Amino acid sequence: GIVFTNYNVEQIKKILEERISESFIENAVEDPALNLCAALAGGEHGDARRAIDLLRVAGELAERQQSDKVTIEHVREASLKIEENKEEASLKSYPLHEKLVLLAIMKANGSSTGEIYSSYKNLCKTVGKDGLTQRRVTQMLSEIELSGIISGRLIHQGIHGRTKKYKLTVSSEMIKKSFKDELTLQDII
């Protein structure tokens, strides 16, 4: 197998140039496109695999658009597409109750832990599942926050002490798209 080490941008460009000479006709990949592939991957601790992926997806996009060149725009589009696919894959991999919590946040965006919990309990009832305890759900919110899919901020509420409000950092479309194949959730998305 290929062992991927950390490369600098120049080395990544060399690797890409080899790939291009194997799989593209001459001059099909514009220089700025090649440079952006290398720069985007070089910034990510020199990941040659990421550069190769970017180039491949950019090439597919160019082909689909019947363009005879891979341009810097194709690379930008490819980069967004790869990010979206990563988000979708990580959302799909959550267990059911985490998904229910994410749907509760989606339905009550910008809500406090308490509001999210009651929204979650309602969703559990709708899909015929027993809800977890509020303490466990609060813990789950902190765990999901670490993944970057939701963001929370502490709000001070006078005599009631403080609560945390959470909102999604991904679009609700992305959540729906990622969960649509899960049978249990089909009625509530």
Where are the regions that the model predicts?
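Terminal-proximal interaction/regulatory segments of ATP-powered molecular machines
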Residues: N109-I189
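The conserved phosphate-sensing helix
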Residues: E44-A62, K69-T71
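Short, well-structured alpha-helical segments
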Residues: D31-A38, I52-L55, Q134, T138
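Conserved C-terminal helix/linker of AAA+ ATPases
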Residues: L61-K86
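Short amphipathic alpha-helical elements of helix-turn-helix/winged-helix folds
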Residues: L40, L61, L103-A108, S119
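Short alpha-helical segments that sit at the start of domains
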Residues: E84-L102
